[in-house]
Amino acid sequence: MHHIYSLLPLRDAARAACVSHGFLLFWRCYSNLTFNVSTLGLARKKSEDWGIFLIDIVDRILRNHSGNGVEALDLCLLSCENIDPSYLDRWLQIAVRSGIKEVKLEMSNFMKKKYSFPCSIFSDDAAASSIRSLCLSTCIFRPTTTLGCLRRLNALSLFSVQITDEGLGHLLSKSFALQQLFIFRCNAIICLKIPSMLQQLKLLTIKLCEKLQVVEINAPRLSSFHFDGALIKISVVDPSPLRDVYFSSPRPSRMLSYACTRLPSITRNVRSLTLVSSDEDANIPMLHSKFPRLKKLEIYIKRPQAVLSLISFLDASPALDSFILHVDGNFVRPDSVVGGENAADDPRWKPQCRHDFLRQVRIIGFCSEKNLVQFVIYILESTPRLDSITLDTTLLSGRMCDINGKSTKMKRRCAMMTEGCVAEAHRAVKVANRYIAGRVPSGVRFQVLEPCSQCHAHTRSRWYYYGLC
């Protein structure tokens, strides 16, 4: 019966405890403590009152809890801008004991003073040894040598946490079983060192850490590495286990140039590579190294004029099976649009290599830019075993509905587009039919997706708002 009771949602478990003495005993050992506006039934109250009610309810629940049997503590306090730190200290002392498996703390960005997470709760080996997932957001965290051994911790997420290089080093040195590490906007970190003792680490994600200058990776089994930020020095002692690599930079940073010169040394065994360039000029160095085992390549570029450089990426990937290109149609220059000339006559675009394993190609944000049209023709002429090619004229993530404009099961929406972007998309459809369709070999599935008529049927203030497909 206790197990069945533990499966009840928080509010249902609380109601049951009000009508039964037996359930009241179970309530005092309730294992899954998830506190947020939704689970506490505060959504119908005025949003400005959420913080007051949430603090009061959570405090009463935890004061009446025995502290035993808690497996998960999830505190979402985004609406609590003025919470007294003593409340948090007390709640953590009650719930974080032996047997705790998951701790998640989300604080408001608008607090005048950041909360300092008490490392002392993990100085006790009983609590430290049982924790499996730790997620902290918008707080101060200062681990020291007194930290207990987190021998079962396999997932660690730090969002906007004020933690130093030294503090993170102490934390990682006690986390031998760590498998996933996510670091987001931790701006006190300058040099991130992933020690070799993290034998089980498989996924490492680093995002927007503004002061980060160096990343040194010594984890011997790292298979997935995602990085989003300024392009810095990154070294991987043994890159052979890496299979999935994602690189993005939010600022103009010559991402593709960086990929040409820096990435081949760490991506020789990578199967999936994603590159997101916020801005790039056309003067990108040729890629002379190889990605011998790369199967999937996905690239985001803003300026379609830079598409010429991508040929070297295709030529450097002899085993490539799938290629996805995202282009921002807002950056089409009027003087670069395909005119009446033959779009395939430029000798620069004549195939130098055959891409014998490339079977699927998708271009999202396809437009009438001359270089992009020639790039598509290059792919058609150099890919003898191509199965399908899709030219999607919508922006961002592409078309979210099927080709008939019907709703998907998830009822996802196409991205909004300006009137100018929609006009360019329709022009791109005509260009594709005139210059590309006739060159597609028989047996290759060829699709040109224009903007969804339902998503972009109405305009307001020159913007096409999200519509339901």
Summary of predicted features, one role per range:
Residues 234-253, 354-356, 365, 382-389:
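Leucine-rich repeat domain C-terminal region
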Residues 89, 93-94, 116-128, 146-153, ...:
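A structural signal for leucine-rich repeat
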Residues 1-187, 195, ...:
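Leucine-rich repeat
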